[in-house]
């Protein structure tokens, strides 16, 4: 048996030598807290995540890395390289919603296909409910995964679900776990029930292992985005995971999640391609900790769907043996949007941002997009110690600009004062004069609530910081005028339902 595995490794290694472009394995959790990884919490949570930690230990991890405030926004920022306000993908997608990636926006997958990559996405998508929004219509050769957050998936199992309303069931019930191919083949493999949730990530993992094997066997570089459903609520822990952490059902599932990451890393080793594979680990947004104990945790202020660091700042790490120095800790500002230009540069296309701005054909289709991301390859590979990103914009899911970070300073224009689940229900409070935080001296944004002399400090510091933030915003708005929002942010309520009638009457009066 050992001889067989040795020969198999040699065969795969030989095939891998036929391609020079790096493979790309992107591993994401869902709502993973910054503090839920032992590389960050240093054992304080009472369990370990050795496989995720391995990526950090063998590469670089970030301290000032930004996702977005919720699922759809974070995922769109990564795969499109654009600010969610530009694509209109700020709101969490729901069953039946006309919300998803528009055909005018190019994806990272399409760009990499142009570079000879085979592409696949396995696991949670959350970038559109309809067939037109499926990943296989946006650059992916294969998709196998679910389309929404877990609590939406299990709604039909609720005894009060209006299953007798045929129209509602037809239009707004969650679709099952979809397997689709770029040739148009779409198969619904069945609903994501509470029972299936216990092990569905293992289904996605097996598909990922098979895809990598096939890609290496073909001698082609691969781009694989593996999106687990863990650790979104409601957590349904597998029977064989119970007790793994000694810290309750949620952390048991977290350990199980880490074990699946380990299987992916081990498979790269077995295929002989680990040294030529970029592995990145992260999550979409900050934790949803108002559902504790079925929730993640972070040292940063508040949680997802707020303006605070806890809603946006997420764990992130990347490994590329021989290219990224082991054991690095990077304090530069980076965000999900930055991976499109960074990974394209790694694939040999360093000017993709300029190409797309001018207009270019990708995978046989014309695109003209503004990428909001920056190429971090020089920083990651040690050619510079200064990152290209100098600012970050905190957009709410309603499309409100709540804050701007420039350098170490954060100016807050609107704050979420609600606690617990009310952060989803209550409006942001717009401030007549903004709050100010220094995210090096006060990374957890405690000063306005805990410091006796905050207002005195504020008066001395805020005027130039507001000016700098306004200048940064003006630069962004100039690009937004040239490349305007693709669609209006969606709503959870009914406020937009009357707009077509108002607009119709307005047109008649003109």
Q: Language-model features: where?
A:
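N-terminal signal peptide c-region/cleavage motif recognized by signal peptidases
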Residues: 13-15
